[in-house]
Amino acid sequence: MDELALSFSLTCLLPENRASLSPSQPLSFQCLKAPATLTWEDEKQQRWGQPHGPVSSPLLGDHRCLVPFRDLNPSSEVNTANLLESPSSLLLTSCYICSYFSFYILGEKRCHSLKRLRYSVCCKVCPNFCACGKENVSGTGQVCTGVHVGAKEQEEPGGTQALRSCGIYCLEERTDKASHEECRERSTLGRPQCTGLTPSLAGESPCPRLLPGSPTVRHLIASSCPGLSDPLPLPPGTLPLGS
């Protein structure tokens, strides 16, 4: 934990009534309103304990979510055909999911440091994460500070629905053309923006990047869901840190 901090923050997926849930029940979640994309100044304020105020985001709204988000199967595509297999799968109605596999590198660790994590799930759901973890990009001057994994309902031929939306956060150590182009190539969403802390999403307002344990997380939950003051913990055994 001195090199990497792992945050599995279900900051917009909170059970409505944890006490009454049984293991066999689908969990009912309420999506929170997310703050706008955080700027560098916002992040400095977070470090000093000044929370960013919550504002409305079109990515969230007041949709209802059914999301026991624990064990995504890395061997299968994410779609409605295989999401309904078990309560531990990702069950989804017509709403956006703002769960996070967020890996924060402390200091100046580069992308290839992420190979210490078991990230096959993230790779399957978000190919950008795999690209970030490859050692052949370790010398490009890129530091991957987080990976956003979301899901969106999308119509496909035959009535099936693909549910995948990915974005990668890159913090440029250098601004030379080679490193910037390589960062652009790692994005598969059409509008890569790999400078600063801007997520590369396809023209949609993203969920925020929240620092692990930051006041912002607690502030969002406390202001949006009275009585739930803490983010949900990382499920035991899920995506452990390597040695």
Swiss-Prot record:
Residues glycosylated per entry: 136
Signal peptide, first to last residue: 1-19
Q: Where in the cell is it found?
A: Secreted
> What GO cellular component entries does it have?
extracellular region
For this UniProt record, the keywords arranged alphabetically read as follows: Glycoprotein, Secreted, Signal
Q: What is its main location?
A: secreted
Query: What name does the UniProt record give this protein?
Result: Uncharacterized protein CD300LD-AS1
